[in-house]
Amino acid sequence: MWDLIIDQTQLLKLKEFGIFNTKTNLNGVIRDHIYSRRNGFDQGVFPEILRHPANCQILHCKENASKRSSSWISIEDLFFKIKNYSGLWVEQELVLDKISQYEQGKRWTNEYRTNN
């Protein structure tokens, strides 16, 4: 996924700080979901949408810790970003179909989740 980064500012951050590692690089960066996975799963957003490169950003580990599970973008803005994504993404057509399904009211459900 690191090779899918097209934003120059984020590429510079990656080059300057490197990838976070608990043993070798505590000052590194990590990949973060702009629209959080937690919000996505709570709202029934399809995983294919959440993993799209347009939903990823590079953050310092400390920034990510302070962000926790909050989203920095609305679902509508994420859909706009994905629909206008100019990079190459192997799942682009699939994700556009999932967005259309979501906009028509269909939601992802975790068939493995048990309600005890």
Q: Where is each model-derived feature located?
A:
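Extended charged
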Residues: I19-N27, S74-N116
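Short Cys/His-centered divalent metal-binding micro-motifs
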Residues: R51-K83
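Histidine-centered nuclease catalytic patch
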Residues: F20-C56, S69
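N-terminal functional modules and adjacent low-complexity/disordered segments of proteins
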Residues: L14-K15, V45, I73-I75
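Contiguous alpha-helical segments
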Residues: M1-I30
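Extended interaction regions within the primary functional domain
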Residues: M1, I34, H60
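Intrinsic structural disorder/low-complexity segments
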Residues: L11-K13, S36, E63, K67
